[in-house]
Amino acid sequence: CTHIKEIEKELKKNKQQLAFEPIDFGYFLNGENDFGSAGGQVACNISGPRRFKAGSVRDHVLGFRGVNGRGEIIKSGGVVVKNVTGYDLSKLICGSYGTLVALTEITFKVLPAPEENKTLIIHNKKLEIAVDLLNKSISSSNDVSGAAILPDDPKVPGSRLNIQKTFQLNDLKHEGSITAIRIEGS
């Protein structure tokens, strides 16, 4: 399957986006950007911080082609959203980890990209404050499209390591949790 990076590059040219926001674990694992493949995202049903607003990968897969374990070509769905009776195989394969079919083609629903987006990064001394801030921002009238907390908690394995490795902003030293809130709109 095609790398997500390539798909997003083409979509950006047309001011479109994959609304489920493919997550990139490269930053957490080795500090490098490598989104992986579209098939991997679908097989694992992995979505990024926009999931609570736009839905998961399975909500954006319109159809697919692939090969099952018997070597048979399987085709499901199409290029438009429609309600059908019976099993929706396009939704069933999401999160199946490739056990049902090896994907060769995927049709995604895409949405217009926002004209503007800003991400606020707030350092908090206590995790409780970070959680409260996140809850208040999501329930506010602002168009929050993504939110995350990176805890600085000794009880959470590797939390200090990830913050120090990934989020050194302009060489600023900080202690505590990080709350990230993204607001989109026009």
Residue ranges and their predicted role:
Residues C1-K91:
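FAD-binding glycine-rich core of flavoenzymes that anchor FAD
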Residues L62-S186:
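C-terminal substrate-binding/cap subdomain adjacent to the FAD-binding core in PCMH-type
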